[in-house]
């Protein structure tokens, strides 16, 4: 049966099934809609099973069609990887998806060391607040903010514990001697942070906090605002590690207040797949890199 099924027919089927439209598949493959329709009918005849349910306005996959799509998608992805590997001088390609602030503050500064330790690997990074869809075959690993909910087919590794605490520029720190001094300082809010100022004030028995003087939708922007002396940021010591180590930021209430701790970021990658070994090597390296480091700035 497989010998009578052409690769081109399978490619047409995969495009139509993935896009949910014969016309869209025709546009993608630069074919006419009738050519797509006839190719799929021939494929159904050769296989002896209906792959699509057709109405006057739409098509949808049958159970058999969905099963074939799952296998066809994996097969074409593996074929693409093989062509990419033999047509490139680079040995391997690692495609990462990452939470934006972690990408900017943690991953990007450390990638040169990873590439130095792993010559012949090319790394591509895409950043967004969404989770990577591994089923599409677009990414090999994902660094996410917050524990992944759908982890049945994933290996999920918690990265280091993060301490969320007030951070500010050294010049501003001289005005802060106790937690109550924060009532009189401009507070910087990170909109997507799971731990907010209200949580920190409550942990320190201070009551409701004053309204923030500014807010940002990314932690790396809040960190940068604090570096520039715009106020006090409630941020992760992991995301602000470079700034703490360089002295651009300090912890004005270190050891005299209660801070919030949690696992903020996780690394996830599929349990199976041709890139599993490379993803595992990256996970091992990143886990080592995220180990806590002491800072001299307080």
From Swiss-Prot:
Pfam families xref list: HTH_1, LysR_substrate
Record's signal peptide: none
Coiled-coil stretches: none
Keyword set, alphabetical order: DNA-binding, Plasmid, Transcription, Transcription regulation
Residues of the DNA-binding region: 22-42
GO BP term, pick one: DNA-templated transcription
GO molecular function, one term: sequence-specific DNA binding
SUPFAM superfamilies for the chain: Periplasmic binding protein-like II (SSF53850), Winged helix' DNA-binding domain (SSF46785)
Domain HTH lysR-type: 5-62
InterPro entries: LysR_subst-bd (IPR005119), Tscrpt_reg_HTH_LysR (IPR000847), WH-like_DNA-bd_sf (IPR036388), WH_DNA-bd_sf (IPR036390)
Keyword set includes Transcription: yes
Family: Belongs to the LysR transcriptional regulatory family.
Protein name per UniProt: Uncharacterized HTH-type transcriptional regulator y4mQ
Species annotation: Sinorhizobium fredii (strain NBRC 101917 / NGR234)
